[in-house]
């Protein structure tokens, strides 16, 4: 099997070639952006009355008090049109990892595959759909709360879980696209900026250290 270092070399070469080809083939176009919403991920760390937290911890326990952090339901969208006004590409950013399907010996796009299929059915098979996973630390698409209600509604819609998640993304994309298409810009500045941000470290208490060593 290909090792990580080998795959990086394999991938970087191909990405570089695609970028060079795209740059050489660039043509006049316009861009627009918009914001929609979709409930996709939830914080996966349950918090209990004694102050402890557990990853994927049960939420039906009597001492369950909430989740360790919040979630971001924004669907940030970029759209690109050619000189004739045809939608040729879109990028979609959601704060949710593509990991609804796990533990299988296969490589797939998870929830993004049905998203691409749905958008291409509306806007043409040659539409490029670029998926971005935003800031999604401790976020998960796995159901943590209202499980029975969520599953009931999904079954009534006769959808798989992947189809349900993609349905929400596409609905959010439609909201964003409706706004983006009204403000198309042909003179957008193209630049690359990198910033290094210093974040404070979380200090482990003596009690937490002792508990961790005791396990």
Question: Locations of the language-model features?
Answer:
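Non-catalytic substrate/cofactor recognition surfaces at enzyme active-site rims
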Residues: 1-215
């Amino acid at each position: 099997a290909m090792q990580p270092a080998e795959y990086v070399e394999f991938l970087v070469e191909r990405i570089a070639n695609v970028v060079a080809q795209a740059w050489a083939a660039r043509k006049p176009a316009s861009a627009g952006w918009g914001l929609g919403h979709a409930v996709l991920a939830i914080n996966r760390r349950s918090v209990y009355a004694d102050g402890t937290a557990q990853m994927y911890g049960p939420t039906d326990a009597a001492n369950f008090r909430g989740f360790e952090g919040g979630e971001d339901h924004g669907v940030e969208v970029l759209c690109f049109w050619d000189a004739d006004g045809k939608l040729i590409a879109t990028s979609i950013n959601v704060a949710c990892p593509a990991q609804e399907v796990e533990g299988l010996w296969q490589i797939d796009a998870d929830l993004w595959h049905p998203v691409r299929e749905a958008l291409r059915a509306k806007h043409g098979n040659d539409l490029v759909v670029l998926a971005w996973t935003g800031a999604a630390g401790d976020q998960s698409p796995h159901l943590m709360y209202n499980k029975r209600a969520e599953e009931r509604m999904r079954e009534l819609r006769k959808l798989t879980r992947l189809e349900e998640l993609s349905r929400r993304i596409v609905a959010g994309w439609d909201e964003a696209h409706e706004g983006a298409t009204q403000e198309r810009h042909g003179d957008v500045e193209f630049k690359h900026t990198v910033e290094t941000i210093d974040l404070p470290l979380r200090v482990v208490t003596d009690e937490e250290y002792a508990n961790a060593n005791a396990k």
